[in-house]
């Protein structure tokens, strides 16, 4: 949740977009501004999970996206599927790609490998800490660059799944994600009124059926 005590939660009300479903799994596209799971306060209950639960009463969330991040979010329809998907994520056999707009010219390919830890004095911020942080790795690939706005479009592939990993790693290498009010509060030159980070791709072998699944979402920026 944002650090600002004056934060008012106003989640988007458009229906969730269903992008994949089988006997065990359901995958939706979460809009930016919607929590993945309910918050502690009554006014923070509206979330992707509760909306999915209304249609699939046994659904379990398998991973999360930050409120400001949009994109592909997967749920298990029942307990056996939840356990199987959890093992799949632990084994790192799921491929996830994100598209982001970042400040500055970032071209070529590279890897960010710096450990992360919660910044307890400024929660929910995370920070780089080489002594106490947990290992975190992110691959990046520059896709294009807009010289007029000084903004690059990049493909991000998280190898690990630390909280705020992509956001902190991009900030660390000097290319913060545009619109990120937590890690890049300066006025961004992007015309977007949101953080430019979208979970665009998910690929895995369905753990119960053995079917190869590849899901591509529509990037809204």
Where are the predicted features?
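Pseudouridine synthases involved in rRNA/tRNA modification
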Residues: 1-25, 31-35, 148-149, 163, ...
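RNA pseudouridine synthases
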Residues: 1-137, 144-148, 196, 221
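Loop/turn elements at beta-strand to alpha-helix junctions within RNA-recognition modules
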Residues: 79, 159-160
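A structural micro-motif recognizing beta-strand termini
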Residues: 103, 156-159
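A generic structural motif
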Residues: 143, 157, 205-207
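Short, solvent-exposed secondary-structure boundary/capping segments
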Residues: 149-156
């Amino acid at each position: 949740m944002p650090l600002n005590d004056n934060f008012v939660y106003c989640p988007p009300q458009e229906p969730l977009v269903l992008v994949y479903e089988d006997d065990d799994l359901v995958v939706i596209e979460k809009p930016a501004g919607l929590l993945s799971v309910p918050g502690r306060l009554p006014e923070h209950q509206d979330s992707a999970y509760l909306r999915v639960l209304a249609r699939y009463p046994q659904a379990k969330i398998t991973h999360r996206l930050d409120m400001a991040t949009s994109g592909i979010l997967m749920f298990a329809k029942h307990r056996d599927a939840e356990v199987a998907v959890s093992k799949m994520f632990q084994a790192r056999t799921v491929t996830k790609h994100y598209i982001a707009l970042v400040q500055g010219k970032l071209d070529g390919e590279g890897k960010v490998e710096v450990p992360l830890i919660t910044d307890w004095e400024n929660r929910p911020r995370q920070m780089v800490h080489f002594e106490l942080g947990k290992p975190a790795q992110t691959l990046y690939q520059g896709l294009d660059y807009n010289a007029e706005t000084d903004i690059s479009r990049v493909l991000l592939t998280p190898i690990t799944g630390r909280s705020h990993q992509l956001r902190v790693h991009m900030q660390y290498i000097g290319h913060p994600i545009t619109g990120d009010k937590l890690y890049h509060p300066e006025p961004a030159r992007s015309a977007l009124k949101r953080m430019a980070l979208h979970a665009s791709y998910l690929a895995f072998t369905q753990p119960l059926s053995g079917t190869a699944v590849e899901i591509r979402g529509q990037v809204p920026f």
